[in-house]
């Protein structure tokens, strides 16, 4: 029964994940959402959203339609190097789908994606996108949640724009380079150089202590950007990686045919391997170490439900 409980919780989480993806696409300016659907209020991580949507493609066909639309209209606002780095944390199937997405990006004229498109992408590029679906002329960088894309449009795609977006998303808190790197996935060296340049230009504040920390004053930036509020930062990448690895496992023969003991062991390994998804986002879930053997399955199902509830209120 415990395994059935996990499977049911996973399906509930899958529906929550699809809802989050649509709300974030709505926030970055696609007309993909259902009329009246609320957009995201937290900052959208563009590369993480692409990978998240690719992982969910078979569960929601419309996501592939909006992804191919983005490959033709908004791909210039994405970092190829960053998405390659983030993709390593997703199930293997996402790697192939990323190559398919990259093929469409190359067809739109962005040659940066050639290294990702692969030699066979043209022959196996996923379902044919439905051309009758209309998602708009291109990204609309209006909503507060689309701030990272807006900063990239203004400052260029790279560490400086994302560093500024991260600092604006933490409400004026002092942040170490290590913390910023955990959120943005840029190297400490790249972020240190970017932060020092921006501090010299007085775009960010640097502390006098060692190791140096950085912050911004949110109010002047909010006024400059003409935003009624600044969207909070969420650590989407580690959370999405946990979600997609978990759902891929629940769909696998390993889960379907395994004993409760083996399934509980794998569930424990998943949570431990992706613990940053919970600690960085402040999601309080049961500790795997507090349960023995198969008894963890019920706690794992609870972890999935808690994560789904957090998604609903935090997106």
Write out the residue ranges for each language-model feature.
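Short amphipathic alpha-helical interaction segments
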Residues: 185-201
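A short, conserved structural fragment
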Residues: 199-209
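Short acidic, hydrophobic short linear motifs in intrinsically disordered regions
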Residues: 171-183
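Elongated scaffolding segments in large macromolecular assemblies
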Residues: 179, 188-193, 227, 244
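Short alpha-helical segments that sit at the start of domains
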Residues: 134-165
């Amino acid at each position: 029964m415990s395994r059935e409980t996990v499977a049911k919780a996973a399906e509930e989480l899958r529906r929550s994940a699809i809802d989050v993806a649509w709300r974030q696409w709505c926030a970055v300016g696609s007309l993909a959402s259902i009329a009246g659907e609320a957009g995201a209020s937290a900052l959208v991580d563009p590369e993480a959203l692409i990978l998240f949507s690719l992982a969910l493609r078979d569960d929601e066909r419309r996501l592939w339609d909006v992804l191919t639309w983005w490959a033709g209209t908004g791909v210039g606002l994405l970092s190829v190097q960053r998405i390659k780095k983030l993709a390593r944390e997703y199930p293997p199937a996402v790697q192939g789908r990323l190559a398919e997405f990259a093929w469409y990006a190359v067809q739109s004229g962005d040659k940066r994606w050639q290294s990702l498109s692969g030699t066979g992408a043209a022959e196996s590029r996923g379902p044919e996108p439905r051309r009758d679906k209309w998602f708009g002329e291109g990204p609309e960088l209006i909503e507060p949640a689309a701030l990272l894309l807006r900063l990239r449009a203004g400052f260029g795609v790279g560490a400086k724009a994302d560093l500024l977006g991260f600092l604006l998303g933490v409400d004026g808190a002092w942040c170490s380079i290590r913390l910023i790197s955990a959120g943005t996935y840029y190297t400490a060296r790249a972020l240190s150089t970017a932060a020092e340049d921006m501090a010299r230009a007085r775009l960010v504040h640097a502390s006098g202590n060692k190791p140096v920390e950085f912050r911004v004053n949110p109010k002047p930036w909010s006024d400059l950007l003409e935003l009624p509020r600044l969207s909070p930062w969420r650590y989407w990448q580690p959370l999405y990686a946990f979600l997609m690895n978990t759902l891929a496992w629940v769909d696998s023969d390993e889960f379907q045919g395994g004993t409760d003991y083996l399934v509980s062991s794998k569930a424990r390994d998943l949570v431990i391997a992706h613990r940053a998804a919970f600690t960085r986002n402040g999601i309080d879930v049961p500790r795997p170490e507090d349960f023995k053997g198969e008894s963890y399955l019920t706690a794992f199902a609870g972890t999935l439900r808690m994560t789904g509830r957090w998604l609903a209120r935090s997106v």
